[in-house]
């Protein structure tokens, strides 16, 4: 059970407190005062008021990653913008078997910018960033990304070398931009005939709305989605990972 301590401005003097499988919640008051040398320990601490004193409060910290990722089919080179959508990012160890350390999802803006929050990372430790999108090729960062003072930044869009194996599509020349390959509708790591067939079937049935077969994000499954996927299938696009 996750331990959460809610602290909402309550006047109290503590010598030491550690909660296990419980919640400590204070609803009213003015401040939390901790005696010198006292400790508060929990898995998560949410502070809405203030505290003073010489002790420590220990809880899991939030690690913030500012990410920039473009999606090939969703990107419009004439406006240098894209249709916003959700991606999930996995933090992975740098060494085989590249175990997943944590994951977080965010909504990418029209500029491809999103903010992710992780709780199981560590400052100064390098992690691969494994990007997943509903109909794009799984793409990893070229090298390890670390957090400094709980913050990190990574931009996949400014160079092909930002992706492991240089595995992205160039979607603009001025400014130079790169994006995740689109068309992996069934998320098997390949853009191939099976993806084309899925799109063809949905297009034939006039499917609309938020669907994996909508490769360009316009909420219509039609020829434009087929063309993007067919071209990447013909180029044998697939995921490239360590």
Please state what every model-predicted region is.
Residues 63-82:
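Short amphipathic, basic-aromatic surface patches that mediate peripheral association
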Residues 112-127, 135:
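Short Pro-Gly-centered beta-turn/loop motif in secreted/extracellular proteins
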Residues 95-113:
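Short, acidic Ser/Thr/Gly-rich low-complexity loop/linker segments typical of extracellular
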Residues 1-25, 64-65:
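Bacterial Sec-dependent N-terminal signal peptides
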Residues 165-171, 185-212, 216-242:
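Alpha-helical segments with a strong preference for the paired helices of cellulosomal dockerin domains
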Residues 21-61:
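Extracellular beta-helix/beta-solenoid repeat scaffolds
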Residues 79-88, 124:
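Short coil-to-beta strand junction motifs in C2/discoidin
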Residues 107-108, 136-170:
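Structured interaction patches on ligand/partner-binding surfaces of diverse proteins
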């Amino acid at each position: 059970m996750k331990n959460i301590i809610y602290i909402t401005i309550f006047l109290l003097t503590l010598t030491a407190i550690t909660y296990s499988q419980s919640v400590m919640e204070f609803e009213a008051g003015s401040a939390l005062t901790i005696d010198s040398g006292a400790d508060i320990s929990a898995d998560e601490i949410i502070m809405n008021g203030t505290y003073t004193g010489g002790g420590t409060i220990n809880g899991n910290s939030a690690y913030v990653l500012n990410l920039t990722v473009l999606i090939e089919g969703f990107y419009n080179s004439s406006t240098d913008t894209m249709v916003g959508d959700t991606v999930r990012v996995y933090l992975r160890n740098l060494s085989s078997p590249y175990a997943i350390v944590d994951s977080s999802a965010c909504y990418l803006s029209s500029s491809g910018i999103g903010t992710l929050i992780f709780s199981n990372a560590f400052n100064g430790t390098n992690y691969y960033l494994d990007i997943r999108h509903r109909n794009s090729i799984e793409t990893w960062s070229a090298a390890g990304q670390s957090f400094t003072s709980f913050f990190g930044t990574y931009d996949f869009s400014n160079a092909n070398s930002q992706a492991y194996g240089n595995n992205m599509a160039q979607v603009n020349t001025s400014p130079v931009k790169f994006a995740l390959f689109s068309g992996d509708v069934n998320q098997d790591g390949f853009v191939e005939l099976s993806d084309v067939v899925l799109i063809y079937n949905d297009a034939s049935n006039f499917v609309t709305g938020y669907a994996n077969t909508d490769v360009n994000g316009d909420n219509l499954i039609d020829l434009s989605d087929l063309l993007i996927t067919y071209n990447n299938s013909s180029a044998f696009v697939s995921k490239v990972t360590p």
